[in-house]
């Protein structure tokens, strides 16, 4: 009837689940009107992280959500005071430009300049976030440039960078090359923090932090930077708790793969960088992981529409606090990357050994899947045995006779690569298979360098390969899947598939990254009619889940569960 409804009393009445409210003229207004359904849904979302004792409040992490309330209200006193901040935070593409100081001795690309502005913008508002650019797009340089730009505002508190041990050298090298004015100190052992003098940036490893967490927790830090942040994706681990306990003005996570297996890993990162953005992990599982990954929906609700709604709500909340650019979007001048799957047929003797093991392990596993949580270790041990048998029987039985068809395929492929004057990175998850690869390459007269977790002089072997001493670099997936710049190679060979595609993508991006001037060829060696075929299909489902949440796909998938494992064991 044209009467104006004040927003704040309406907001409070809906939040308190009232069916009607009294207007200024004494008349009652029904709150069951369909026009209020959208507002009621938004309040249900906001109540998860708001307090109502002193009136409606919304954390500054929910400003994108607050903009939805603004859309529904004609007037809101609270919205007036929050409008300027909400306008900027709800669309991070409009962040004010930060001028990269002359002390940064690098020419940043436009997307990198925007990354610097985004980091500085969130820091000014004391909001953390996730820089989720594709691997190889220069996340380290963007952070260093942002630290240089905000150096005068640090207030004497150094930034703390936590990274895998293998990546610490990269921070040292890039800071010395690009921001030499920044005073960078490396803490490489327990007790080392006490010896740090005046520094702008302190760099340490996750291992040192875990062993010396009390000393780090006692300090007050400016920026906290988590490089390769997937290291803290499990909230049940000691390292996650140690990182969460650190006192910092603002926290940023760097990872091209902010989750690899499940959305709960994304929640674990955001609980550090943006605490309060989402409800508890339990509710996050119920409200997002269940519908999006596993298709769990309430009764009498159309499943597809409900999953899409939950996915869009997740995207909307995450979008202001995550910046992700892919190579296809911002590095059009990067040489192309081609991929080819090479199917390897097992020899008759190898096939006989594999099939016998498959029948035995299949019967064992299928009987355990009804209680996967309790039997997970046994199940994955059996799956790992089948994966190793797909490579070579000798990985399980050193006395086994017969050669490995995959090793034969590797040698043949490398001979062709070397004849063309190219150089190759060869990855395997199993160091024992790298041992067999060494023997095969030695017999073929192919020179190689090797890097795995036991390598003492990591920088030395990397430098030797970069210097051109050998045409082949054998690398374990865990030791060399991140933190290396190996653009000297333009061929990548993946000897065995891993459960999730993110780990393999990180390995490929050792060669296909900024600085590469030649097309990169990726070969995936898959043993035909083995568990490797099934693992490859599982990878594709996980890639769809990643794309559905972080990229603009409308696809849905599930994490690894009992049904996935049954699929791995199908004939």
Model-derived regions, located:
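Charged, low-complexity intrinsically disordered regions
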Residues: 1-88, 156, 266
């Amino acid at each position: 009837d044209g009467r104006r409804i004040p927003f704040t009393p309406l907001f409070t009445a809906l939040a308190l689940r009232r069916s009607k409210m009294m207007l200024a003229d004494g008349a009652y207004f029904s709150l069951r009107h369909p026009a209020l359904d959208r507002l009621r849904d938004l309040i249900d979302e906001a109540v998860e992280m708001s307090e109502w004792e002193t009136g409606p409040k919304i954390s500054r992490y929910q400003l994108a959500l607050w903009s939805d309330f603004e859309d529904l209200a004609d007037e809101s006193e609270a919205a007036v005071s929050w409008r300027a901040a909400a306008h900027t935070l709800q669309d991070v593409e409009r962040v004010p430009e930060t001028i990269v100081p002359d002390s940064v001795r690098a020419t940043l690309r436009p997307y990198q300049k925007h990354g610097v502005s985004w980091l500085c913008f969130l820091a000014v508002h004391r909001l953390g976030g996730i820089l989720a650019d594709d691997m190889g797009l220069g996340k380290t340089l963007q952070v260093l440039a942002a630290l240089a730009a905000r150096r005068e505002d640090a207030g004497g508190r150094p930034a703390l960078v936590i990274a895998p041990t293998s990546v610490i050298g990269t921070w040292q090298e890039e800071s010395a090359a690009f921001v030499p004015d920044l005073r960078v100190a490396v803490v490489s052992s327990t007790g080392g923090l006490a010896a740090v003098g005046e520094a702008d940036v302190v760099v340490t490893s996750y291992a040192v932090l875990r062993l010396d967490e009390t000393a780090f927790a006692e300090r007050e830090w400016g920026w906290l930077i988590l490089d390769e942040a997937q290291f803290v994706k499990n909230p049940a681990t000691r390292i996650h708790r140690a990182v969460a306990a650190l006192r910092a003005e603002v926290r940023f996570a760097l990872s091209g793969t902010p989750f690899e297996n499940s959305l709960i890993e994304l929640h674990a990162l955001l609980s550090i960088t943006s605490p309060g953005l989402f409800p508890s992990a339990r509710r996050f599982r119920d409200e997002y992981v269940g519908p999006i990954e596993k298709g769990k929906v309430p009764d009498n609700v159309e499943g597809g529409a409900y999953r899409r709604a939950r996915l869009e709500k997740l995207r909307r909340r995450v979008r202001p606090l995550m910046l992700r650019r892919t190579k296809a979007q911002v590095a059009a001048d990067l040489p192309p990357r081609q991929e080819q799957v090479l199917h390897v047929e097992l020899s008759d003797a190898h096939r006989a050994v594999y099939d016998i093991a498959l029948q035995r392990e299949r019967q064992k596993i299928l009987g355990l899947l009804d209680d996967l949580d309790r039997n997970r270790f046994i199940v994955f041990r059996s799956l790992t045995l089948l994966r190793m048998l797909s490579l070579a029987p000798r990985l399980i039985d050193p006395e086994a006779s017969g050669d490995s068809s995959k090793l034969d395929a590797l040698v043949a492929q490398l001979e062709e690569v070397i004849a063309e004057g190219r150089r190759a990175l060869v990855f395997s998850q199993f160091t024992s298979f790298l041992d067999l690869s060494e023997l095969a390459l030695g017999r073929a007269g192919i020179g190689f360098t090797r890097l795995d977790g036991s390598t003492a002089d990591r920088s030395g072997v990397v430098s030797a390969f970069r210097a051109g001493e050998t045409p082949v670099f054998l690398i374990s997936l865990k030791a060399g899947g991140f933190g290396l710049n190996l653009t000297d190679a333009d061929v990548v060979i993946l000897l065995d598939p891993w459960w999730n595609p993110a780990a393999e993508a990180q390995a490929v991006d050792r060669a296909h990254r900024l600085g590469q001037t030649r097309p990169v060829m990726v070969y995936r060696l898959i043993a035909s009619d083995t568990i490797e075929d099934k693992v490859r299909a599982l990878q594709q489902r996980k890639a769809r889940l990643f794309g559905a949440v972080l990229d603009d796909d409308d696809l849905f998938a599930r994490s690894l569960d009992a049904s996935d494992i049954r699929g791995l064991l199908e004939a």
